[in-house]
Amino acid sequence: NSCQSLYLGCLLSLNREKDFNEKYKELADKKACNSDIGGIVEHANIIYGKKYTSTFCHESINYVFIEKINEELFSENDLKELISYSKMSKKEDRSQGLLENGIQTSGNLFSLDYPFIKSIQKALEIKIEKYKKKFPNSGQGFINNWPKNYELSAWMISMKTGGFLKSHNHEYGWITGSFYLQIPKYKNNDDSGNIAFSYQGPRYPNKGKNFNLTIKKIETRDICIFPSSLFHHTIPFNSSEERI
């Protein structure tokens, strides 16, 4: 399945529309379903002016969910401990090509045995279940083929002023989520520090087409969940505070 979607992505990168069309039909007939296919198909729809239906998630921008994780689910003390851990662990950060003026923790946070990590994991699992139940009759592949067993992976990203994440999607994931521990208050009420979504894959040709950008406002304690096929980036910000 992943090899086939990789091949589909290569055909899109090479702008071989006829071959792409044939491969898409073959994968659609097989009901191949992964986030890589989802991202590829939505980009292709724009540049080829087609209406391919994504077997993973069609019109994935409609499946962005933002909600607060309140203190009942994740205490203020645990949140502060998580921020402290992020500041202490900076010596173990890994390089991240998509990240400008920021740092990312290495490894999977959920492999750590701290009470505040267990607490945020439990809160996230509750929100993930709520997300799944929000779209019961959507007919979308990623809901209908929801994995019976899944593993959560998490890392922390801290950005300083001017920092941002470049556009990407998570082609090996199922759903993607961001939980915001600290979002600075910005002087001007613009889109600084917000998250932006698009069907434009940065590795694929755009053929001069216009890709709509959808920007969602995020605040401290918000969780934003969306299909892993959806390309996203963040808007640079200007603040003396870190964005975590």
Language-model segments: which ranges?
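Catalytic core of non-heme Fe(II) oxygenases with the double-stranded beta-helix
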Residues: 115-125, 129-225, 233-236, 241-244
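Alpha-helical protein-protein interaction scaffolds
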Residues: 1-50
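Non-heme Fe(II)/2-oxoglutarate
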Residues: 53-143
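Generic structural signal for short, solvent-exposed loop/turn connectors between secondary structure elements
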Residues: 2-4, 26-31, 75-79, 88-91, ...
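Short, exposed beta-strand "edge-strand" segments with a Pro/Gly-rich flavor and a Y/T-containing core
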Residues: 64-70, 219-226
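Residue-level recognition of well-ordered secondary-structure positions
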Residues: 21, 38, 80-83, 125, ...
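Conserved catalytic-core motifs of GNAT/GCN5-like acyltransferases
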Residues: 230
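Glycine-centered flexibility motif
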Residues: 49, 97-106, 191-198
